[in-house]
């Protein structure tokens, strides 16, 4: 019970407004595009390039050719530049499903005791011969013909009939019994739903489905148990075995038998099969890199990106500060709808900047400036020209600038802060590229920059660097610069997080002081870190009148003066005559 004063005395009370605010969430880049494998149209956080390779693959073969998707190059560039995480949304054409395990043999039941399904989707997961994509061929040592690093196999071991337990291993598809490559293992699994080691509980049984309510496309989760496996889920348990103990306290099983051997799997290994979904879905030729066209971007059409873009609208579920879909080119009419959707997505969310490519490979400066003039958004930036890099296939390929620019942003965030310009020789360098499509002259850079296109310049001895930081906003204001837009994104994210914690609190001075006690120190730190010249925060009776309070509102006004960058340096050299004196 709170202390009260009935008779004269002193009541000491305390009011703690020294809350320690969390640092702004450090979200990474959202990448949309085709991948070799992985979940389809399911935004997935990846925290290293090695993890990306395991989940989404790197290269694949089609006929006698070997390919790499631009998405893979973008992911590698981002992590090499110091990025912490990316949100990958795989785009496909056609229907893709997971592969299921080949028949698991049980000791004494007609059906297999349980079934597994790969989390990754597509026919690539079928570990089989080319003549029959749904039937794997096993060799005498237990290996599988034509297995690859991109598909899987399963193995049952350590079967204990007395205890009703067994082990499950997921192995890489190109290994063999003499040299196993075990990706993950689960031990002491049980088919008893009441057991802590019940296979669905330990491995997981969830699957994701794409749904729509007519306005928004979203991902629904089906299944009770979170997937702890990175590669498979339990799609069904056909013969659950309850751990009954007989009346004598010794015998086990509902029928009084002394073991679980009737429904347990025997020690064995096998492959996965039955997955649907081809990387190209019949689009031939599959145009990659510099050959991307209006109707063919890496074996897809631009329309294939529609649902993936829509899914990312939910800013409460998916957090990122950059979005890029390398392979979509604004110049192409069929791509324009999807890129407009990405730009609109960034504007609506208000917490990310879209990096888009304006022109196809081989365009001229006038082509680029003409295309850029059709876009007007402070949440969008474009860069030119294209760049040449070495693909994982060993070939030199041409890639659009949006492939590597998120990496430049990541480097800037790590080396300085989001409100520093991701440009120049200090922070704008682009590593691991061979050459730019064009070595721009000073006049060409001026023409591009006047049209809000950020030039990628080549300087002798200094390499290839981003040499501009404009957004595609046509109106001249502070927000026509990338560093200011990213500053605002960062500030709004922090202040928004603080404000969210105050919703449903009492509309009193205590709540206002709580807000100010967190926001003012943060803005002070931004001033000290060269992001702002000055700021002022107003949240008091002047803007929270009785009428505002009666409407259940709390109003805060934040006035800022963003720090500007040095983009033009003027140096005056004056030649003095002999005998001239210089003042102190």
Indicate residue ranges for each PLM-predicted region:
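Intrinsically disordered, low-complexity regulatory segments in eukaryotic proteins
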Residues: 138-161, 309-314
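Conserved aromatic
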Residues: 46, 183-186
């Amino acid at each position: 019970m709170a202390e009260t004063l009935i008779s004269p005395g002193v009541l000491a009370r305390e009011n703690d407004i020294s809350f320690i605010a969390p640092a702004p969430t450090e979200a990474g880049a959202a990448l949309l595009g085709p991948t070799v494998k992985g979940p389809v149209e399911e935004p997935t956080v990846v925290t290293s390039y090695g993890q990306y390779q395991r989940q989404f693959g790197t290269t694949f073969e089609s006929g006698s050719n070997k390919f790499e998707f631009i998405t893979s190059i973008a992911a590698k560039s981002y992590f090499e530049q110091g990025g912490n995480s990316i949100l990958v949304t795989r785009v496909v054409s056609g229907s893709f499903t997971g592969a299921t395990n080949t028949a698991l043999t049980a000791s004494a039941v007609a059906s297999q005791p349980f079934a597994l399904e790969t989390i990754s989707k597509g026919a690539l997961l079928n570990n089989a011969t080319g003549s029959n994509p749904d039937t794997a061929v096993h060799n005498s040592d237990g290996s599988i013909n034509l297995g690859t690093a991109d598909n899987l196999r399963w193995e049952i071991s350590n079967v204990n009939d007395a205890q009703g337990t067994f082990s499950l291993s997921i192995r890489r598809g190109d290994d063999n019994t003499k040299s196993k490559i075990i990706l993950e293992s689960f031990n002491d699994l049980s088919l008893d739903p009441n057991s802590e080691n019940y296979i669905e509980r330990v491995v997981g049984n969830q699957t994701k489905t794409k749904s729509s309510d007519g306005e928004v496309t979203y991902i629904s989760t089906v299944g009770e148990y979170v997937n702890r496996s990175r590669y498979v889920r339990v799609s069904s348990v056909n013969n659950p075995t309850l751990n009954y103990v007989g009346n004598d306290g010794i015998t086990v099983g509902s029928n009084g038998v002394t073991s679980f051997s009737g429904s347990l799997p025997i020690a064995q290994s096998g492959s996965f099969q039955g997955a649907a979904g081809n990387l190209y879905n019949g689009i031939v030729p599959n145009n990659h890199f510099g050959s991307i066209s209006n109707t063919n971007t890496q074996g897809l059409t631009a329309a294939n990106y529609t649902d993936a873009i829509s899914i990312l609208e939910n800013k409460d579920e998916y957090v990122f500060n950059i979005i890029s879909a390398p392979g979509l080119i604004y110049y192409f009419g069929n791509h324009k709808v999807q890129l407009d959707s990405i730009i609109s997505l960034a504007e609506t969310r208000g917490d990310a900047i879209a990096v888009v490519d304006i022109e196809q490979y081989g365009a001229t400066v006038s082509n680029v400036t003409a295309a850029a003039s059709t876009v007007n958004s402070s949440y969008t930036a474009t860069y030119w020209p294209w760049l040449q890099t070495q693909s994982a296939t060993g070939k030199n390929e041409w890639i659009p600038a949006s492939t590597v620019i998120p990496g430049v942003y990541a480097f800037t965030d790590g080396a300085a802060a989001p409100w520093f310009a991701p440009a120049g020789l200090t922070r704008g360098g682009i590593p691991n590229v061979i050459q730019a499509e064009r070595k721009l002259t000073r006049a060409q850079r001026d023409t591009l920059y006047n049209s809000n296109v950020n030039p990628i310049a080549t300087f002798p001895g200094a390499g290839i660097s981003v040499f501009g930081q404009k957004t595609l906003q046509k109106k001249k204001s502070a927000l026509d610069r990338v560093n200011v837009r990213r500053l605002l994104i960062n500030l709004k994210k922090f202040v928004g997080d603080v404000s969210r914690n105050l919703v449903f609190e009492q509309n009193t001075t205590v709540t206002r002081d709580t807000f100010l006690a967190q926001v003012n120190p943060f803005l002070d730190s931004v001033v000290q870190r060269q992001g702002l010249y000055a700021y002022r925060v107003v949240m008091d009776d002047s803007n929270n009148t009785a009428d505002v309070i009666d409407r259940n509102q709390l109003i805060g006004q934040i006035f800022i003066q963003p720090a500007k960058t040095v983009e033009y340096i003027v140096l005056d050299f004056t030649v003095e005559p002999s005998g001239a004196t210089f003042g102190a």
